[in-house]
Amino acid sequence: MAATSSSAFLLNPLTSRHRPFKYSPELSSLSLSSRKAAAFDVSSAAFTLKRQSRSDVVCKAVSIKPEAGVEGLNIADNAAQLIGKTPMVYLNNVVKGCVASVAAKLEIMEPCCSVKDRIGYSMITDAEEKGLITPGKSVLVESTSGNTGIGLAFIAASKGYKLILTMPASMSLERRVLLRAFGAELVLTEPAKGMTGAIQKAEEILKKTPNSYMLQQFDNPANPKIHYETTGPEIWEDTRGKIDILVAGIGTGGTITGVGRFIKERKPELKVIGVEPTESAILSGGKPGPHKIQGIGAGFVPKNLDLAIVDEYIAISSEEAIETSKQLALQEGLLVGISSGAAAAAAIQVAKRPENAGKLIAVVFPSFGERYLSTQLFQSIREECEQMQPEL
């Protein structure tokens, strides 16, 4: 296959997961329920047409295998080509009392179930294109709260890189298991030191490891760049430019910076709202501290974060984030992580403001809930299941 840029395969116009929705100006005048019904009718008709004629199906990367005598199949050549083009869905039941519509960008549907799959691919590919790393020779080193590490690990495994990760011991057990399953080496750091401690340990490993290279997700332009090139355009396309407000958690700052910049260039009046933990609300003027919202609230201002892009910060407590995550599963059928709960809680707050009546809010759900089964998010359910006995 011909070489492509780090995001080329992510930007094909249609994918097998991308809804064949055709926007019509007439839809904008309908009520929310009528608009959804109309969109469903159009989508269903388009899908029927697609089934009748499969020759025009385009996936994220159309397979080219001439040596096998088969070309143009709707089959990706490797797992990395499954990244991106994640769907959006309206929230319907947790938004009672809201005057704005809330649509979630489901990054939980990435191949390794988090938004960090995008930057894992982007940072490795960018370093390769610059001649900084070589498969089978270079040792990749990075600090992670888990999801970036997983995104890096599955790409590193497919390309033949050794990967050493540092992670606070407070992160979920599932993260440890997944990282090891992909063959990554894992070094745990003191929970009290947060991501700062993990970064310091990664820097120590970098100094003593030959042929090593640190990807630096908090200070790597390839991070916001991939969101500017892919996530932002996807949200813009799926909302047909009707998005009024963007809500996203702030971890590395890559998602909110890349997406916010792309959309604001096309719609300057877009309002961008960043979400951080109440217990570590440094962007809102607070102090860093321990919290339970894994993936956001690193305790410092990441260099990737463009402060000029963000219009407002909302602090959400760990307890509210956890409870909202639970309600998303129980009421919406969406099993999401704690940071998704935080983002949803913030989006619901914004959607209840009278000045936002009739507006469309897009909120990013970064990761899948199954990665949090050992955390407080599922503690009561886990204890209940552990006590279950077979019926006689």
From Swiss-Prot:
Span of the transit peptide along the chain: 1-60
Pathway: Amino-acid biosynthesis; L-cysteine biosynthesis; L-cysteine from L-serine: step 2/2
Location of N-acetylalanine modifications: A61
Enzyme Commission number(s): 2.5.1.47
Binding annotation for pyridoxal 5'-phosphate: N147, G251, T252, G253, G254, T255, S339
Main localization (coarse): plastid
Phenotype upon gene inactivation: No visible phenotype.
UniProt cross-references to Gene3D superfamilies, sorted A to Z: 3.40.50.1100
Catalytic activity as recorded in UniProt: O-acetyl-L-serine + hydrogen sulfide = L-cysteine + acetate
Coiled coil start-end: none
Intracellular or extracellular location(s): Plastid, Chloroplast stroma; Plastid, Chromoplast
UniProt keyword annotations, A-Z: Acetylation, Amino-acid biosynthesis, Chloroplast, Chromoplast, Cysteine biosynthesis, Plastid, Pyridoxal phosphate, Transferase, Transit peptide
UniProt xrefs under Pfam families: PALP
One Gene Ontology CC term in the entry: plastid
SUPFAM superfamilies in the record: Tryptophan synthase beta subunit-like PLP-dependent enzymes (SSF53686)
Modified residues (N6-(pyridoxal phosphate)lysine): K116
Signal peptide positions (record): none
Requisite cofactors: pyridoxal 5'-phosphate
Domain of life where this protein originates: Eukaryota
GO BP, sorted A to Z: cysteine biosynthetic process; cysteine biosynthetic process from serine; double fertilization forming a zygote and endosperm; pollen tube growth
Homology family: Belongs to the cysteine synthase/cystathionine beta-synthase family.
Job of this protein: Acts as a major cysteine synthase.
Subunit details: Homodimer. Component of the cysteine synthase complex (CSC) composed of two OAS-TL dimers and one SAT hexamer.
Name the record gives this protein: Cysteine synthase, chloroplastic/chromoplastic
Lineage summary: Eukaryota, Viridiplantae, Streptophyta, Embryophyta, Tracheophyta
Gene name in the database record: OASB
